[in-house]
Every structure is written in structure tokens, then in C-alpha cells.
Amino acid sequence: MASTQNIVEEVQKMLDTYDTNKDGEITKAEAVEYFKGKKAFNPERSAIYLFQVYDKDNDGKITIKELAGDIDFDKALKEYKEKQAKSKQQEAEVEEDIEAFILRHNKDDNTDITKDELIQGFKETGAKDPEKSANFILTEMDTNKDGTITVKELRVYYQKVQKLLNPDQ
């Protein structure tokens, strides 16, 4: 883990190097270019994290004042790591939800779930109207409207649910 001094030096270097118009502000585009230069795995995501930590007024720019103000770098790093841990936990929850859904409804051990499998699953769980429940699920999850639900469609659906439950993430 980098020391606070290293972080301060890196931020100053970033300002000196990538504040292209020398206005004392870093835009998201400048940050993305910075991380590309550093050969970051995902420069856009790195820029987003940078802005989540340092763009205190959420105006889409990181200013020298925001960087040099009352920033507690250790606290900022801790918050960043907590957000990362929460994000990983949410990803794990999505995968658990997908697995549970597949186990409950997939009757022929392939990866797609059909309307008939949904109906059968709802019958087994005692749903009042299994066909209506199946139709609702297909309407919500079957994005390509082919009559089956794929793992990809499940993942997209459960990620949307996570975002609704955790809008600040």
C-alpha cells in the first residue's frame, strides 16, 4: 500500500502533468488520459473511483482546493477500500441470486430457463397463479423476448436490482 506521502506526490505529479490547460482542475477526460498513460487495466473505472474520492462537490472536476484542502488521505483510502469491498459483496450477492434462481427453475440442466420451467418452479413453490408469475418474470427478465431467460439476462436484471437497492454505489 502506498504511503500518504506517495499519494500526495502522485496527485501533484498528476496535476503538473495532466492538468493540460493549467487551470488547477482535472477533468474526467484528463484523468482517463492519466490512467491510460499509467497503463491502468481500466482507465475509465480508475477515473470514476478517483472522482468518487476527490471530487467533493461532485461538479465533475477535481480542483487543487479539493486536493489540498482538509483531505485526510488515509480516510479517503479507507473509504475507497470500503466501497470496493461493498461492491464485491454486491457482485457476490448477484451471483448467489442467479444461482438460486437457476436451481429453483432450471429443470433440464441447461443454462436457459423456459416459460414451462418457470411455471413448474412456481407450482412447486405453491404460487397462486404460476402462469401469471412466469409471464411477469419473462416480461421483466427476457430482454430479447425469445421466451427463455439466459444467465446473462439474469445477471443484468439482478445488477439493476442491486443498483435500485444501493443507489449510492
From Swiss-Prot:
Name by which UniProt lists this protein: Calfumirin-1
- Which InterPro entries does this one have? EF-hand-dom_pair, EF_Hand_1_Ca_BS, EF_hand_dom
Q: Which residues bind Ca(2+) 3?
A: 108, 110, 112, 117
Q: Which positions bind Ca(2+) 2?
A: 55, 57, 59, 61, 66
The residues the entry assigns to the signal sequence are none
Write down the Pfam families for this protein, in alphabetical order. EF-hand_5, EF-hand_7
Gene3D superfamilies per the UniProt record, alphabetical? EF-hand
Which annotated residues bind Ca(2+) 4?
A: 142, 144, 146, 148, 153
**Which gene underlies this protein?**
cafA
Domain EF-hand, first and last residues per copy: 6-41, 42-77, 93-128, 129-164
Q: What is the lineage of its organism?
A: Eukaryota, Amoebozoa, Evosea, Eumycetozoa, Dictyostelia
Alphabetically, the GO molecular function entries are: calcium ion binding
Provenance organism? Dictyostelium discoideum (Social amoeba)
Describe its function.
Answer: May be involved in the phase-shift of cells from growth to differentiation.
Q: Can the keyword Metal-binding be found in this entry's annotation?
A: yes
Alphabetically list the UniProt keywords.
Answer: Calcium, Metal-binding, Repeat
Query: What is the top-level taxon of the source organism?
Result: Eukaryota
- Gene Ontology BP terms: adenylate cyclase-activating G protein-coupled cAMP receptor signaling pathway; cellular response to starvation; oscillatory cAMP signaling
Please list the residues that bind Ca(2+) 1: 19, 21, 23, 25, 30
